[in-house]
Amino acid sequence: EDDTSTVSRRLALTLLVGAAAVGSKVSPADAAYGEAANVFGKPKTNTDFTAINGDGFQVQVPAKWNPSREVEYPGQVLRYEDNFDATSNLNVMVTPTDKKSITDYGSPEEFLSQVNYLLGKQAYFGETACEGGFDNNAVATANILETNIQDVGGKPYYYLSVLTRTADEDEGGKHQLITATVNGGKLYICKAQAGDKRWFKGANKFVEKAATSFSVA
């Protein structure tokens, strides 16, 4: 009887273990091939972004943004914006240049000073002693938060993060991310932005992904 009882307990334990194994899902750490719980299906795609292939460039645009016909900058060839907030948008500009590399413009800061029309007319860089932080002849202030230089496909790219603010700005300012490079006698610039309030409510991840995804062919 003891032997029979022992066998019964072992059998019950085996059945329980088997049931637990069947009911559990494959975790990412346990999935040897494919994706978790999707081993035999199609790979998952990032539905938050749409790949755009332009003339000589490609970029990932937030899927919920739509194309816009508004032309805001010289050489603009692409514009997408958030339907619910046009302050959140992406622009791609392509203009002729005699430079062989983006580094021929100088440092990222020096480059930005040569294309400061991207930040708004009469943008002022730095701090002012005037009340409200604005110079009498400036309609906007621009503070460079971060710059970076990276090599992508053998070409140097400039990345800049800039916070602009105007006297009548109700969003608290705009976070503007700029990616720039030179290829084949052309200057390529991608600028993605969002208002300060939306930036800290999650818009930053969409703007950052879009700006850093930009590359030339």
From Swiss-Prot:
The modification Phosphoserine is found at S107. One of its GO terms (cellular component) is extrinsic component of membrane. It is found in: Plastid, Chloroplast thylakoid membrane. The keyword Cell division does not apply. GO terms for molecular function: calcium ion binding. Residues 1-31 form a transit peptide. Its main location: plastid. One of its GO terms (biological process) is photosynthesis. InterPro entries: Mog1/PsbP_a/b/a-sand, PsbP_C. Keywords: Chloroplast, Membrane, Phosphoprotein, Photosynthesis, Photosystem II, Plastid, Thylakoid, Transit peptide. It comes from the Eukaryota. Pfam families: PsbP. Belongs to the PsbP family. May be involved in the regulation of photosystem II. This is Oxygen-evolving enhancer protein 2, chloroplastic. It comes from Brassica juncea. The lineage of its organism: Eukaryota, Viridiplantae, Streptophyta, Embryophyta, Tracheophyta.
